Amino acid sequence: MDKGDRGILQIREMATELLKNAGCTAHLKIKKQFPGGRLVGGKYHPHTHTITLYTETIRRQCELLFGSCKWFMPYATIVLAHEIGHAMDENLPALSAAFEESGRLPEKQALALTIEQNAWDFAGRLVPAHLRPLFQKIMDESLSAYRQPVIAGAH
């Protein structure tokens, strides 16, 4: 078994445990990169109730935020916890519908922030205490992209 196979196996074991702890029945896919080149580490697909983790994209995010891949597995755990947060969000269908129906950019931005904040709130309950500082940094970095337009639109 090579290093890549061990890494995938580690991720699958971590994911199985995290999904079980969350009571989440979503299916898991593991791929290398998010299509189109954007730095998306994970994606929840509500129509198929599937979470996809993008390992090389997560690795790149980890390098950009922390300067190395030292925190890769904890980072992947946090990304998965966030995606589980989307999967477990009972308000996601209504929020997504409101997002799609809205023609106003400020409203869309506020809805996107709510969707992301809900997922992070749920994820925070899944992440072990020893990963809290790392979780906080990743969450803050992720949410800043959603908060900035909302704050700018409020002024």
Model-found features: residue ranges?
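A structural signal for well-ordered alpha-helical segments within the folded catalytic domains
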Residues: 9, 75-78, 82, 117-121
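Long, well-structured alpha-helical subdomains associated
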Residues: 1-6, 43, 72-74, 107-113, ...
